[in-house]
C-alpha cells in the first residue's frame, strides 16, 4: 500500500462512454486513479500527467457483484483509501409495455438497478469508515420522465435514482455524499447508431428534440460531473440531475 496526500478516485469503466473523459478530468484536478478496463493508451496518458494509476481488468460488467468489490479492493490495497467513485451501467430494453415480457423486466432490472446496487454497496462501506467520500451514479435522463418506447428502461432507471437518494439519506451523517446524474442525447457512437443519427438528416431530427438544439459531448459532461466527485463541493447529496439539454 502506498501513502498519498492526493485524492483517490475510482472510475468503474474507463474505456466506455464518459469513463475516459472522467479519468482525464480527475487527473487534471490532482487525483490518483483506480480504473476499470481503461481505454487503450489512457493509463500512459494519465501517468504522464502525474497521476498514479491502478488498473483492474475484467470488471466491466457491474451486474456481477465481484466487479465492484474488485475495484474498491484495488483502491484500498494500492492507496489505502477511496475518496470518490463513479460508475455508469445500464441495459436498454425497448418496445411497448403491452408487448413486454417478464424476461424483459428482469433484464432491465439487472442492468439498471442491480448493477448500481452492487456498486453502491461496495463503494460506500470504506467511505463510511473514513468518515467522508463521494459517489456518483451515472444513469439516464429517462428516469425523470415517461419515455415512449422504453417504459421498462425508464422505470428501472427511476428505481436507481430512488436507490441513490435513499443511500444518500442513510449515509449523510457519515460524511458520505451520494448523487446521480442521468444523460440523454449524447454525442456518442452507441447513441448515434441506436437513434439512427449517423445519418445527418436523422441527426437533425434528433437534435430538434433537444431544447438546446444539439447533442452533448463527453468532455462537457465530465466537467459537469466534476463537483460531484472532485472534493470541491461537499454540501450536496441525495440529488438527481438530468443532463440532457433541457429534455428532462
Q: Model-derived features: where do they sit?
A:
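Residue(s) in the substrate-gating loop at a strand-loop-helix junction
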Residues: 140
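Substrate-binding pocket helix/loop in short-chain dehydrogenase/reductase
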Residues: 96-97, 101-109, 202, 206
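Alpha-helical segment proximal to the catalytic Tyr-Lys
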Residues: 125, 169-170, 234
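Short, small/polar-rich loop/turn modules that mediate ligand/substrate recognition or access, typified
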Residues: 172, 177, 236-238
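Short C-terminal tail/terminal secondary-structure segment
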Residues: 226, 233, 237-248
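Active-site helix of classical SDR
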Residues: 120, 156, 164
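Canonical Rossmann dinucleotide-binding motif of NAD(H)/NADP(H)-dependent dehydrogenases/reductases
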Residues: 2-34
Amino acid at each position: 500500500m502506498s501513502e498519498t496526500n492526493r485524492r483517490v478516485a475510482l472510475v468503474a469503466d474507463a474505456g466506455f462512454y464518459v469513463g475516459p473523459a472522467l479519468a482525464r478530468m480527475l487527473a487534471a484536478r490532482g487525483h490518483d486513479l483506480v480504473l476499470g478496463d481503461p481505454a487503450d493508451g489512457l493509463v500512459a496518458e494519465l501517468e504522464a500527467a502525474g497521476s498514479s494509476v491502478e488498473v483492474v481488468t475484467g470488471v466491466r460488467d457491474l451486474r456481477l457483484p465481484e466487479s465492484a468489490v474488485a475495484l474498491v479492493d484495488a483502491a484500498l490495497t494500492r492507496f489505502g483509501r477511496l475518496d470518490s467513485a463513479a460508475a455508469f451501467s445500464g441495459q436498454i430494453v425497448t418496445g411497448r409495455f403491452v408487448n413486454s415480457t417478464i424476461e424483459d423486466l428482469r433484464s432491465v432490472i439487472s442492468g439498471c438497478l442491480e448493477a448500481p446496487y452492487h456498486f453502491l454497496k461496495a463503494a460506500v462501506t470504506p467511505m463510511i469508515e473514513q468518515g467522508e467520500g463521494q459517489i456518483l451514479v451515472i444513469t439516464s435522463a429517462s428516469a425523470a420522465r415517461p419515455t415512449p418506447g422504453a417504459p421498462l428502461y425508464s422505470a428501472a432507471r427511476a428505481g436507481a435514482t430512488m436507490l441513490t437518494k435513499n443511500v444518500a439519506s442513510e449515509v449523510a451523517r457519515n460524511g458520505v455524499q451520494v448523487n446521480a446524474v442521468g444523460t440523454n442525447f449524447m454525442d456518442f457512437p452507441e447513441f448515434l447508431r441506436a437513434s439512427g443519427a449517423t445519418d445527418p438528416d436523422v441527426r437533425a431530427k434528433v437534435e430538434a428534440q433537444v431544447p438546446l438544439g444539439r447533442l452533448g459531448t463527453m468532455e462537457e459532461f465530465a466537467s459537469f460531473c466534476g463537483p460531484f466527485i472532485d472534493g470541491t463541493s461537499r454540501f450536496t447529496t441525495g440529488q438527481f440531475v438530468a443532463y440532457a439539454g433541457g429534455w428532462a
